[in-house]
Amino acid sequence: MEYINLYDVTKCTGCRGCQVACKQWNQLPANIVPFSGGYSTKEDTDAKTFTIIKYFEEEDANGKVTWRFRKHQCLHCGDPACMKVCPREAIFITDFGAVAKDYDKCVGCKYCVAACPFEIPKYDGEIDKVTKCEMCVDRMKVFMEKPDSTDPAKQRDKYNYVPACAKTCVTGSIKFGPKDQLLKEAEARVAFLKANGSPNANIYNPSGVGGVHKVYVLADAPEKYGLPSNPTIPSYINVWQPWIKPYGGILIGLAALGAVGSFFSTRIIKAMRIGEHEGGKTHDA
């Protein structure tokens, strides 16, 4: 059965509890960063920060300020570009839908960094690996092993093992559950928002990447929350898979040429990406 995280921006208070819970569960160190002048603690995720809350401030012609929050992390695409380009097959989709990694196989080539339409994976030079949110696969292993139960106590115990961000959210902004069930809840929520002053409310579950397993309920257009309106798997990946990927793996397997192979292969990806964008094709990244 597929599961998703459903994040409703209209219920989020920007408390950053999910950000802290993610750090704690994954045993990630704190980052000391310079003050950026905004309200976000960080401008973007990094190799040791998998989840952040982004703040967006908009002032209208009358001087009225609108605040928007958004939880920013890997969206766990149904058809992940990162997995398609990985020459070591270190990236895989779990039984419940998360996009996870086998860190023993990862060689830090950064192909996934270049390919992701959301620019999520980040390289960690200290361990020579690329990291990202994995939807707490260790917690989810326990969750999946526990059967559903009509006994409320047993069912609560099962749901103690949902991803840390969902477990800690006090407002109900982040929910975790069966995909079909939560998508129905999302549709009902959007209908409610449209009827109550948010005519542009929508579900962010882009089909261009095969749908996602971190679905958003947005009160306005995706661009208002710093999201691409129509992200797609770049067409160059169709070239990459049959022609370049096999040789990329061979290069990485040769210690003497690994750095060279990674250097040129990632630049091939980036060059194709830029060329596609300049050529006028749809591309949001």
Report each predicted region and the residues it spans.
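Non-ligating segments of multi-cofactor redox enzymes
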Residues: 1-285
